[in-house]
Amino acid sequence: MLLQFSVTNHRSIKDTAIISLKASTDKSLSDCLISPDEKKQLVPVLALYGANAAGKSNVLHALLLMREMVCGRYAKLLKGESLPQEPFAFTDQPTQPTSFEAIYFYGGIKYAYGFSFDKSKVLTEYLYHWPNGREALVFSREGNGYQFRENVQEQLTLAGRTAENRLYLSSSNEWNCPQTEKAYLWFFEKLTGFMGTEMRLDATLSAIRQGGSEKSRILHEMLYADLGIKDIRITGPKEEPIISALHTLDAEDGTSKGFWLPLGQESVGTQRFFSRIGMWLAALEAGSVLVVDEIESSMHPLLTRHLIEMVQDAAINTNHAQLIFTTHDTGLLDLTLLRRDQIWFAEKNEKTMQTDIYALTEFSPRKGENISKGYLQGRYGAIPFIGGDAAWAE
């Protein structure tokens, strides 16, 4: 479970931006809250709103990039290869480092992990945990200097094998370091997502190929979404699967006839729902953090709402999955769907070109307030001022 993520100097984000999934004292929709321990309550869903080019997607991009640097394509860079730094461009100090930090729970233990880097090397890196409710250092790094709390000599050996453009959390995992294993596994097992209009079919296709209850869950959701699809068939090689959807026509004599259509002939919204439902079900089963840019992309608003309700529903989300998404859909600004502490905004300062991230709770909205109307009227910022006037939503 993710408690908080912060990012500094990444794309349009210059100063530190923070999103927090810690629940406020708001009593509404309290049944949806998830608890990593006896003292804390977290929200399962965080929605991020903002105008086009405001930088809301950059927050999600940073979180997923952090994962890629820990356990993805940037985790095993060769010596001399560049790190994927994309610093804030509108500045006289373009060489400033980028930094990420995630505070999360894995196996009932709280972790705080972060690092800073430039295009050539990791500058700082640290990991803390709270195994008995008290903060304790696991390791810290500044340049080539390391500090360790346990198994110092063994970890110094591993540190000596860690290139300057690699994270110690990544390299130590390759050598099965028990001190960093669980902190690493959160990124590897519990954090996933996609950006923009990307279609990720892997999870859905895997469930269908497994058959049985896994396929039944996919078909149940397709039927629930009223897409007219009765079955899914996959043929051809695994590398280039041919996906077909079964539709039926009822004749006047009471019989029905089935027709298989290529998935590519379905609407874009249907294809989008098909690609996402597998990831949704997998995240719910694993208790993962699912990061989704433009959640409503090409889908009917009711389908988008259904996907959010699945994570909000404690009876469905029994493994404490979380969903972080960006959207323009003001229909989701509904306090019967989301709590006030689940709604966040991104706004770009037109003078500095910096993105600011802030929560709806900073405005102390009243219970029952029409958040959608207030947002379109500019009450909370984070909207485009077309022609300089946003007062049309009266």
Each predicted region: which residue ranges?
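Electropositive, glycine-dotted interaction segments
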Residues: K110-K238
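Pre-Walker A-like glycine/lysine-rich segment at the N-terminus of P-loop NTPase domains
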Residues: M1-L65
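Conserved ABC ATPase signature
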Residues: V45-Y49, P237-L281, V289-L302
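Conserved P-loop NTP-binding catalytic core
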Residues: I34-Q41, V45-A47, A51, L60-Y113, ...
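Extended helical coiled-coil dimerization/tether regions that scaffold
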Residues: T8, M199-Q265, F385-E394
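Conserved catalytic network of the ASCE P-loop NTPase/AAA+ motor domain
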Residues: K40-Q41, Q93-T95, F105-G108, L281-L284, ...
